[in-house]
Every structure is written in structure tokens, then in C-alpha cells.
């Protein structure tokens, strides 16, 4: 694994725990925490579902790339990326060269359990959210694994934080 340069970038599907674990890691490392989805919504002045509604997924992805470019140049950060950030090669290259990339992995059933009551996830506003998560998982899991420096199972938050801290200190 490449040396940890003070930038931890978390990737994975929605519900994998990127934001929750990211906040915990930032606190433990005494770093600043950023959630790219939050930053996109703040910059746009509207929630993510509204961006999807007004601009479609492609418009959202363009905003995502612009925000990632601004965030990855900051020192000592933990960055939680949106689940689809890795869909664009430009984003994958950007995060790979900018920091240590960790794929937080969880199976679709766990992801559904974690996102079931969250209406702010535009891609899950479908008749069968589990089928949609399985479809996203099948398409994205290989990309996450190729992009990440390493993969961590996203289960118990405390244990996952400890695992990440150990991996970063190697």
C-alpha cells in the first residue's frame, strides 16, 4: 500500500457507512471531515434529490467532479464520496492520486437495512429497492475494488474504525 499522505478517501455504495465512519475517523485523526454529497448540496443551495430532478444524474455527476477537485487538494482530510463518484474515470484517477482510498464494503441486504427509511436517496425511490441495490452492487463492486488501496468490511462502526487506524499506521 502507498504511504498515508494525510488524506483518507472513503468510497462505497450508499449505506456503507462512509459518512458515519468518516466522521469517526476524522475525529480520531484530528482531521477535517468532508462529505462530497453535503458539499454539492451546500454549493447548489438545494438538496441532492432536487439536483437530480432538475439536472438529472449527469448534471449531478458534473457537480460532483467539480467538488471533488476542490476537496482533494485540502490537507489532512477524511473525505466521504458519493456512491457513484467512481463511475467517472476522471474521478477515479483524481481520488487515486490524491490520497489513500478505502472501499467500505457491505452486501446489498445490509445496505437496504441501513437506507430503508432514508427518502433522500434518489436512486432508491423505486418499486424494489433491494433489486436496485443488487444491480448497483454488481456494477460498482469491481470498480470500487479496482479504485481502492484496500477494502474494509463495514460492519460494527467501532471495529471498522480500529481496522482502518491499524491499516493506515502500517
Swiss-Prot record:
It comes from the Bacteria. One of its GO terms (molecular function) is magnesium ion binding. It catalyses: shikimate + ATP = 3-phosphoshikimate + ADP + H(+). Mg(2+) binds at residue 19. Substrate binds at residues 37, 61, 83, 140. Its cofactor is Mg(2+). It is an enzyme of class 2 (transferase). Its EC number is 2.7.1.71. InterPro entries: P-loop_NTPase (IPR027417), Shikimate/glucono_kinase (IPR031322), Shikimate_kinase/TSH1 (IPR000623), Shikimate_kinase_CS (IPR023000). HAMAP family: Shikimate_kinase (MF_00109). Monomer. Catalyzes the specific phosphorylation of the 3-hydroxyl group of shikimic acid using ATP as a cosubstrate. This is Putative shikimate kinase. It comes from Neisseria meningitidis serogroup B (strain ATCC BAA-335 / MC58). The gene is aroK.
